[in-house]
């Protein structure tokens, strides 16, 4: 790997880690939101329904809802940084793969995750803007995208693990 490739990988990894810090522990991170809603935190990393969203938002005042809105704006940045990190990892782990179909699937999983995350964030941010009115259909749709996002993260982790094992097997066969 050349020097530029290493620098790009370091930058992508650092952007991912910094954005992860901000969505978890930053000034508007999930740990801050949890202080506002009796420890529930954000809904976007849980399986949820309309009642859970209502319960998570009801203890929050207008100022706290504004902080929650900021969380989703920061989370959009995290979605992009995490996506770049995921794509970098699958690219590196599966650099030996020659099948176009398998490559499309491998790269498709993190892209699908990112699309689901963006749609979910947009719906939940819109929900915060319309609160205290909550559109039950929108929350149901958002929850489906959240489930798909969480499943695709699990599939991505499994793919990376399989790719690493595959690389070791190929290395040992030499």
PLM region descriptions:
Residues 56-61, 65, 81, 85-94, ...:
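Membrane-helix exit/interface motif
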């Amino acid at each position: 790997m050349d020097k530029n490739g290493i620098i790009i990988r370091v930058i992508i990894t650092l952007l991912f880690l910094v954005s992860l810090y901000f969505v978890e522990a930053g000034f508007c991170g999930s740990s801050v939101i949890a202080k506002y809603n009796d420890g529930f935190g954000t809904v976007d990393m849980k399986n949820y329904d309309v009642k859970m969203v209502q319960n998570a938002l009801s203890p929050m005042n207008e100022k706290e809802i504004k902080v929650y809105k900021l969380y989703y704006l920061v989370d959009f940045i995290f979605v992009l940084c995490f996506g770049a990190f995921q794509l970098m990892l699958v690219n590196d782990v599966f650099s030996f793969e020659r099948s176009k179909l398998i490559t499309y699937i491998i790269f498709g999983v993190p892209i699908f995750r990112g699309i689901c995350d963006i749609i979910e964030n947009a719906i939940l941010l819109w929900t915060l803007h319309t609160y205290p009115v909550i559109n039950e259909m929108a929350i149901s749709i958002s929850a489906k995208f959240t489930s798909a996002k969480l499943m695709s993260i699990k599939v991505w982790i499994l793919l990376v693990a399989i790719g690493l094992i595959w690389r070791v097997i190929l290395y040992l066969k030499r």
